[in-house]
A protein has these predicted regions:
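Sterically constrained small-residue positions within well-ordered secondary structures
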Residues: 8-10, 48, 78
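N-terminal, Lys/Arg-enriched amphipathic/low-complexity engagement segments
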Residues: 18-52
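N-terminal signal peptide c-region/cleavage motif recognized by signal peptidases
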Residues: 12-17
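Short hydrophobic/aromatic-rich motifs at helix boundaries and adjacent loops
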Residues: 5, 45-47, 141-142
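A short, Trp-centered hydrophobic/proline-enriched beta-strand micro-motif
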Residues: 51-59
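Acidic/His-rich structured neighborhood in mature extracellular/periplasmic domains
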Residues: 23-31, 35, 61-192
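Sec-dependent signal peptide recognition
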Residues: 2-8
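Activation targets extended, charge/polar-rich intrinsically disordered C-terminal tails
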Residues: 144-261
């Protein structure tokens, strides 16, 4: 048990340096580590029971209730041939405006100082699962081909200057569905629009925008069209909007949630 906790602490410290949250060195309590690992275990059991090979998996790392949002971060989870589930997702390096794509286990995914110990996922249709699994099994360079390092947590849903984590996941989904024709972010976004995706519109006034831009390296608004930005309409990709879109577009089942008691 002591060895397991030590490993968890190391994993947690690594995530703090990459997940776009506070860079303060806060030692996690054994209780938080245990809860994160319990959530990972229970989620794995439920994913196994679903019969899925690939899901879009979300966590609640921040309190976004004032924006009407429940989940903060989205990844693509898949069941390996060996049995364990892995998650491919984009993480912001703390204190910076850059990000990269990582493959991690469920334990690491849920050890990121969660606001709420709840997992949620969508099981894609069999066709979408097949396409995603094929993409995930390709070379690493293929799965990250639409990733760009410049990062803003509120990047414009239809822009290419920045890219946040949820945006990478859904653009990667688009590329997996049309691998022969989608080779750029603009093409992926055109496919999303064709399928009826609608981003979340956040109402952020000028003082909120100014405070966010000055106080955080990973928040920028200059990629948003002026007519939207200056009317306080910030359109960005959120987990909640993706979860509403996929069933509507016939790409997946209704979202499933599990909350650790």
């Amino acid at each position: 048990m002591k060895r397991a906790l030590a490993v968890c602490l190391l994993a947690f410290a690594a995530l703090q340096a990459q997940a776009g949250r506070s860079c303060e060195q806060v030692r996690p309590s054994p209780e938080l580590i245990l809860k994160g690992m319990q959530l990972a275990e229970r989620t794995s059991q439920q994913l196994d029971a679903s019969g899925a090979r690939v899901v879009l998996l979300a966590r609640a790392g921040q309190d976004l209730s004032k924006y009407g949002l429940r989940y903060s971060h989205l990844g693509i989870a898949y069941k390996t041939d060996e049995g364990p589930w892995r998650v491919v997702h984009k993480l912001n390096q703390c204190g910076t405006a850059v990000a990269a794509v990582y493959r991690q286990g469920l334990g690491e995914f849920f050890l990121d100082d969660l606001w709420r110990y709840e997992a949620a996922w969508i099981v894609p249709t069999p066709q979408v699962q097949t396409q995603l699994l094929a993409a995930l099994n390709e070379s690493p360079s293929r799965i990250v081909r639409l990733n760009v390092a410049p990062y803003s947590i509120v990047s414009y849903a239809w822009g290419q200057k920045y890219q946040q984590s949820n945006q990478w996941a859904v653009e990667t989904l688009a590329a997996a569905m049309e691998p022969a024709t989608i080779n750029s972010r603009a093409q992926a976004q055109a496919w999303m629009q064709f399928k009826g995706y609608e981003p979340t519109t956040l109402k952020l006034g000028p003082l909120t925008r100014l405070g966010g831009r000055v106080g955080s390296a990973n928040i920028a608004f200059d990629d948003h069209p002026n007519e939207k930005r200056f009317s306080d309409r910030i359109e960005t990709v959120t987990v909640d909007s993706v979860f509403a879109w996929m069933p509507r577009a016939g790409l997946g089942a209704a979202p499933v949630a599990f909350k650790l008691q």
